[in-house]
Amino acid sequence: MKGKVAQKRAAASPSGVGEVIRVMPAVVDVEFPHGGVPEVLGALESELEYAGEKLVLEVAQHLGDRMVRCVAMGSTDSLSRGDKFISTGNQMMAPVGRGTLGRVFDVLGRPIDGLGSVSSDVEFRPIHAKAPSLSEQRVAAEVLVTGIKVVDLLAPYLKGGKVGLFGGAGVGKTVLIMELISNVARAHKGFSVFAGVGERTREGNDLYREMVESGVISRDEPSKSQAVLVYGQMNEPPGARMRVALTALTMAEYFRDSEGQDVLFFVDNVFRFTQSGSEVSALLGRIPSAVGYQPTLAAEMGAMQERITSTNTGSITSVQAIYVPADDLTDPAPAASFAHLDSTTVLSRQISELGIYPAVDPLESTSQALSPEVVGSEHYEVAQEVKRILQTYKSLQDIIAILGMDELSQEDKLLVARARKIQRFLSQPFHVAEVFTGHPGSFVSLEDTVRSFKGLVEGQYDDLPEAAFYMVGGIDDAVKKAASLK
């Protein structure tokens, strides 16, 4: 069932009928006749419909000879002892293929966008898969150009890498995500898959509508869309929230392995993936480990994260929103994620209050790719000089606030002027925000980004006014804007 072996749901033949003997919230015990006990991770489907849909269970444990304990993917409120469940003979399956583009799915791959069933050319694959073997993985470190200056210069993303996206509400996280989706489609002809794990229904709805408005998703012609959305919403049982990321990842793997795409895979929020696993673990009766988390935390996180990688055919680059409980970075849940990250993109409220978007903090954001071996010596040196200038400006701000600019040396005054220009030049008009800002969007190539900032730090543009650097693409746009300001 792995790789290019696709299966239709209809092909799954029942291999046994079991009877419900115990119902708990989100967990169900089912008894099967001898010889008909399904495997662990096998999917069971109810004979009856509950609230208009069949209930799906996933086998989590074998209890004795004939009994299995299962995790429910839907509400168990209407379930009764004696209800029948059929073993499908398969794991839970996810729809894959171009027919999924522009659609919104739940954890079971059922469309929830009101646009009817998916096209008949969609295949179904099991959501549990092994990570690519060492021989299948591409080891060459290659930068994924996003077209966003601040990211490409100071915290570049690796193809097949994992990026942690840190940011509170209202600092532009959604717009940044949509621009990344749009730019990857534009520059790499790649698709994006978004997994809403424990997502608020309102936020998920807002994201979908904004994607439709910006053209990332086309409701009239879904095949022209650039993204797939998969939601396991906050009101759903922990089983659905725990598995929705794997459903979305299976869709992303298809685009990588079968179509050779460079895929962007978004997870919002990784903490909720861990949290739902903790809930399920407690319901299954496992003894918790530190701080109440499941004893299998590291294994569950690793099983998902190791599937996100570059192969010889394509890549999956993951951008993962991470909530840090009580700002405690030593908490086991975020700590388990940090071990897998290659880059961090930190969105700052202080920068957004200055009106600089994207509000990426250039000093807090980091990347393993920012080394001479990966990006080249010129890019590395320019990035380090930009950071040095911004850091010095930050340290001088208290002096400026108390004593004023006049008390600075000529050298410091020049450095502050360059820092303010760099700060504004890190802003950029986005394609997906054209409707709101009135500025045409700009995709800046990596070569143009490095050339532009190199000229800035070397003082080639000291004569241009600060305003010329705000909300432009490359340095040529800044020069044109400066001419228009005169």
From Swiss-Prot:
CDD domains: ATP-synt_F1_beta_C, ATP-synt_F1_beta_N, F1-ATPase_beta_CD
Keyword ATP-binding tagged: yes
Localization: Cell inner membrane
Pfam family, one: ATP-synt_ab_N
Gene3D superfamilies: 2.40.10.170, Bovine Mitochondrial F1-atpase, Atp Synthase Beta Chain, Chain D, domain 3, P-loop containing nucleotide triphosphate hydrolases
Function: Produces ATP from ADP in the presence of a proton gradient across the membrane. The catalytic sites are hosted primarily by the beta subunits.
Protein name, per record: ATP synthase subunit beta
Organism expressing this protein natively: Anaplasma marginale (strain St. Maries)
